[in-house]
Amino acid sequence: DAHAAVYEMAGSLMKRQDLFDATKLSPKDVQRYGTHEFGRHMLLARNMLEAGVRFVKVTSYGWDTHGDNFHGHRSLMPRFDQAYAAIIEDLHERGMLDRVVVIAMSEFGRTPRINGHIGRDHWPEAWSLALAGCRMKRGTVVGKPNDLGTFVDGDAFDIGHMFHTWFAALGIDSTKVEYDNHGQPLPIAHDACSVVK
C-alpha cells in the first residue's frame, strides 16, 4: 500500500510540469529568493511543497572549503541567508510552517583550526544545524562546543537524536519498529537515542 501511494504521488508530480517552468516564477519572488542557483532551487522547493510534495531536498554546493575558506564563505553565506529566510517567511505567511520541518545541515563540521591553505578541513566532532517549523520552539539553542570549538561541551547529540526529533515534530512515532523482508526488527530511529528537547 505504501509503495503504491508513493508511486501515485510521483505520477501526480510528473503531471505538474508547470512547477518546474522558470518562466512562470514571479519576478518579485525570484528577487526575494535570489537570482543565484540556490535561490531558484529554494523557490522551486517552496512551490513543490505548496503543490503537496511531502519531501524536498535542496543542496547548496561549495561549502567544502579546504582552501580559501573566508572568500568562499563571503559569497556562499549571503546566498544561503537570503533563500533560507525567504522560504521560512513564505511558509509562515502561507500557514504551512507548522506542517513543514525545514532542516539546514551538513554531514559534518569544519576544523576550528585554519589549515595551510587558509581553509578548514572535515571535523565530525562538533557541528551545528538549524531547524524551523512544526511546532519547534523558536529561538532555542541546544548544546555548545568547548572553548576551542573542538568538541561538544556536555551532552552530545548525533543523527539518531535528530531523526527522533524530526519525526516527533512531524507527529510520527519515532519508536515505531518496521520489519524488513526477513522479519528483522528495523526501528525507524535508533532506539538508543531520543528526542532533543
Model-derived regions: residue spans:
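Ligand-binding pockets and gating/stacking loops
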Residues: D1-K197
